[in-house]
């Protein structure tokens, strides 16, 4: 698991590097599906002092199997998403400013241009709010459940992120670094959408044919963007 712990450590260290977190906020995880184990950031440990060996290994029930620290308080959310969506290899949660602002406003991040469409096939959805019972109960588990309720059976890698109402963004990808990459993009397109709607409050969504073109040329069966 040492290689995966190193990858998760590096991905977590990318969060302050890209301005996605403040203090000890945020967490990144990755899963080893063959072993049924997840590596995740320890709870409340400062990025400045964190080391790869500080990463915590848990099984799919959340039991710590390796590590000196408690795992992230959001571990149950990560595990619920891994259980539901086999294509996920890494998950990240941040409180990045603009994506969190959309979450606090209770609004999906609208697909307004090609930058958004290069990564997200449509709006980045916002979940419903959790009930008092859901918050007072198994809060982190129920956060995962409301994300799944919102995504449904859609392929999560086609919309690799979501904003949780009054909370903040979660993003995911094929591995930990891909998840962080998508979180960075989500923050950028959230900022772009806010600026664009400030300039033109009547601004409509990107044309569907343009969105389809940009997403499919990077992610479709006949994708031709980049090098092979």
From Swiss-Prot:
Substrate binds at residues 26-27, 43-44, 72-73. Zn(2+) binds at residues 74, 93, 95, 167. Induction: Induced by L-ascorbate. Repressed by UlaR. Keywords: Carbohydrate metabolism, Isomerase, Metal-binding, Zinc. GO terms for cellular component: cytosol. The active site is at residues 118, 225. PANTHER family: FUCULOSE PHOSPHATE ALDOLASE, L-RIBULOSE-5-PHOSPHATE 4-EPIMERASE ULAF. This is L-ribulose-5-phosphate 4-epimerase UlaF. It comes from Escherichia coli O6:H1 (strain CFT073 / ATCC 700928 / UPEC).
């Amino acid at each position: 698991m040492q290689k995966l712990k190193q990858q998760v450590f590096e991905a977590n260290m990318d969060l302050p590097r890209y301005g996605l977190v403040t203090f000890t906020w945020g967490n990144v995880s990755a899963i080893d599906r063959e072993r049924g184990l997840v590596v995740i950031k320890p709870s409340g440990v400062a990025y400045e002092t964190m080391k790869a060996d500080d990463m915590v290994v848990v099984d799919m029930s959340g039991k710590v199997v390796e590590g000196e620290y408690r795992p992230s308080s959001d571990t149950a959310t990560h595990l619920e998403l891994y259980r539901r969506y086999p294509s996920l290899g890494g998950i990240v949660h941040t409180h990045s400013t603009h994506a969190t602002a959309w979450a606090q406003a209770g609004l999906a991040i609208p697909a307004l241009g090609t930058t958004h469409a290069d990564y997200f096939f449509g709006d980045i959805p916002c979940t419903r709010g959790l009930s008092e019972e859901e918050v007072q109960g198994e809060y982190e588990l129920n956060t995962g459940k409301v994300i799944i309720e919102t995504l449904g059976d859609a392929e999560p890698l086609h919309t690799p992120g979501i904003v949780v109402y009054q909370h903040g963004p979660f993003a995911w990808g094929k591995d930990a670094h891909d998840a962080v990459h998508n979180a960075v993009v989500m923050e950028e397109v959230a900022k772009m959408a806010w600026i664009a709607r400030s300039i033109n409050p009547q601004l409509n969504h990107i044309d569907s044919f343009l969105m389809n073109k940009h997403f499919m040329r990077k992610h479709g069966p006949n994708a031709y963007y980049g090098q092979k």
